[in-house]
């Protein structure tokens, strides 16, 4: 079914965007002056 394919692709796209946002927030916070968590 085409709807199922669309949903799967949409979920993949959302996951990709979420991961990108997550990485950006991590990279953005790592540049600010504060001690590393590790």
Swiss-Prot record:
Family membership: Belongs to the glucagon family.
Subcellular localization: Secreted
GO MF term (any one): toxin activity
Gene Ontology BP terms: regulation of blood pressure
Entry annotated with the keyword Glycoprotein: yes
Coiled-coil residue windows: none
Role: O-linked and free exendin-1 and exendin-1b have vasoactive intestinal peptide(VIP)/secretin-like biological activities. They interact with rat and human VIP receptors 1 (VIPR1) and 2 (VIPR2), with the highest affinity for the human VIPR2. They induce hypotension that is mediated by relaxation of cardiac smooth muscle.
Protein name according to UniProt: Exendin-1
Gene Ontology CC entries for this record: extracellular region
Entries under Pfam families matching the protein: Hormone_2
Glycosylation sites: 32
Sorted UniProt keywords: G-protein coupled receptor impairing toxin, Glycoprotein, Hypotensive agent, Secreted, Toxin
Taxonomic superkingdom: Eukaryota
Tissue distribution: Expressed by the venom gland.
